[in-house]
A protein has these predicted regions:
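Gram-negative bacterial Sec-dependent N-terminal signal peptides
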Residues: 2-18
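Generic cytosolic/nucleocytoplasmic N-terminal low-complexity/intrinsically disordered segments
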Residues: 1-2, 251
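Periplasmic c-type cytochrome electron-transfer domains
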Residues: 19-343
Length: 343
């Protein structure tokens, strides 16, 4: 009986210390402005919805079809999902985005993930768009991307009776279908692409959600100063100074220099295990190398191998639970639908 009691007491003490350690780490995370995706769907909706373009089931379903429809591109070959592939972490897995006529991005910019992009404070690497509705208009028109003028996109969509009917259900039959409305609808779908992870489970109170290495990685991530730029719910997503201490070793690949003040949007770290290659020009393929490079150029510290391994384990814990997306059957083109062009 005495042995059993001692073992039981030991287990209770161990459990108590474990809980205390987890509570301390959560407090540390909160102090570093690391915030979880809420557990409640109602709270998530408050986080991602906007009064100017509210989420409805009809808009989400229509937006999903438009997101996957290559007819929004001039060639009829490229959809939003081409560069922001929902099966590939919301990115495309190549250093620089490939667009119209198989042209690589002229600035050698990497495609950011669309997952959790609603949590960003700005969109694009130079932060030029304030929200998803504005962002969705850019790639469709950009010559090196989808290369489709506004009028062409609108004519294609309005020529397809099934789309006209769906827009009527989503917005009312009197609402005019415009290019801006098409982009707004895509944005509604993108707002639903939020991926809570076991990291969020831990911050929301589940002590066992992260293992020892992941917790050590989270603590190291905070202690080294990584959360300074990769904080908030998004773990990034806002404008930050780049090359604070020294030059990025691949700075000469591409001509991107940030916004007018040299600031760069810090990418979200959510699902980062799935979104290699890394950095704005996609020149680093491993998390280990990315961690060490960031320590050097941003923080001015040499992150040792053990610390790097722990941070890497933490970053992998940010891989989230994806919403189930059923690939849509798109409505057929009609006789007066403008034809694709590769010119």
């Amino acid at each position: 009986m005495k042995k059993i009691s001692i073992v039981a007491i030991g287990l209770v003490l161990s459990s108590s210390l474990f809980a205390s350690s987890s509570d301390d780490l959560r407090k540390k995370a909160a102090g570093a402005n690391l915030l979880p995706i809420p557990q409640s769907q109602a709270e998530v909706l408050k986080l991602v919805d906007v009064a100017t373009n509210p989420i409805t089931d009809a808009k989400v379903e229509l937006g999903k079809k438009l997101y996957f429809d290559p007819r929004l591109s001039k060639s009829g070959l490229i959809s939003c999902n081409t560069c922001h592939n929902l099966a590939l972490g919301g990115a495309d897995g190549v250093p620089a985005a490939i667009g119209h006529k198989w042209t690589a991005n002229p600035h050698h910019l990497n495609s950011p993930t669309v997952y959790n992009s609603v949590l960003n404070s700005v969109q694009f690497w130079n932060g030029r768009s304030p929200h998803l509705e504005d962002q969705a208009q850019g790639p469709i028109q950009a010559p090196p991307e989808m290369a489709a003028p506004k009028d062409l996109v609108t004519k294609r969509i309005t020529s397809i009776g099934a789309y006209v009917e769906e827009f009527g259900k989503a917005y009312g039959k009197k609402e005019k279908i415009t290019f801006e409305k098409i982009a707004d609808t895509i944005a509604v779908f993108e707002r639903t692409l939020v991926t809570p992870s076991k990291y969020d489970d831990f911050l929301n109170g589940d002590d066992s959600a992260l293992n020892k290495s992941e917790k050590e990685g989270l603590a190291t991530f905070i202690d080294k100063g990584c959360a300074t730029c990769h904080g908030g719910v998004a773990l990034g997503g806002d404008m930050q100074p780049f090359e604070v201490v020294k030059k990025y070793k691949f700075a000469k690949v591409g001509d991107f220099s940030g916004d007018k003040n040299g600031m760069v949007k810090a990418p979200t770290l959510r699902n980062i295990q799935e979104t290699a290659p890394y950095f704005h020009n996609g020149q680093i393929w491993s998390l280990k190398e990315a961690i060490k490079e960031m320590g050097s150029i941003q923080l001015g510290v040499a992150i040792n191998d053990k610390e790097t391994k722990n941070i890497e384990q933490f970053l992998k814990a940010l891989t989230g639970r994806k919403p189930k997306i059923e690939y849509p059957i798109l409505p057929p083109s009609e006789e007066d639908t403008p034809l694709p062009s590769t010119i």
